[in-house]
Amino acid sequence: MYRNSEYYPDPTAGAALRQLYRKEKDLNTGKQFEAAWKKSMPPDAWCYRLKDSAASYYGGNESLSFSIDNICDFDVYRYPMHHYFELKTIETPSIPLEKILGRFDRDKQKYHKLKHITDMAAAAAYRGQTAHVVINYYRGKVNRTFAVPASAVLDYLNTQTRKSIPWQWAALHGIEVEQHQLRVHWRYDVDGLLRKLEEMEDNA
């Protein structure tokens, strides 16, 4: 049937625009968290932000052949320890596994970015190194941040049937990162987190 687009606009346009808006909002929120995390670094810690994958700038297309494939978001060193941090934000009380592990490939039956977390866990197996997924549950009654070991995320994937990680599980298996709000932005007690990780290393 003929449809005059001037009087009968594409009914899918609104949904598409809303989806693009949500993606942009998520990206902006994630970038704000990363910026706040870096500004929260103690002065005696070296912090390097690894470059984003090209997929981040092309609508989340994870199959780009020229896409950079970094192990995590932040590489941090403070004597005597080396830390890997992957940062994630979510506005719901439970974060989908695809938000951490990438798109699930039904043909291969695995997550696209599973190797990132696997490599992080492997790195943390060496003395003096840690690897954590830092999850910021930033909306509603939760509004808390937890550093969850990469190995614990893998254990969750292999032992749980849920396709998302609730904040209660993150609180139980991770380390809470204290936070406080400035006028607009947030600051995180990264120094306190590093101290706890150093103490855990000393007691290992």
Please describe what each predicted stretch is:
Residues 1-204:
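Catalytic phosphate/metal-binding cores of nucleic-acid and nucleotide-processing enzymes, i.e., regions
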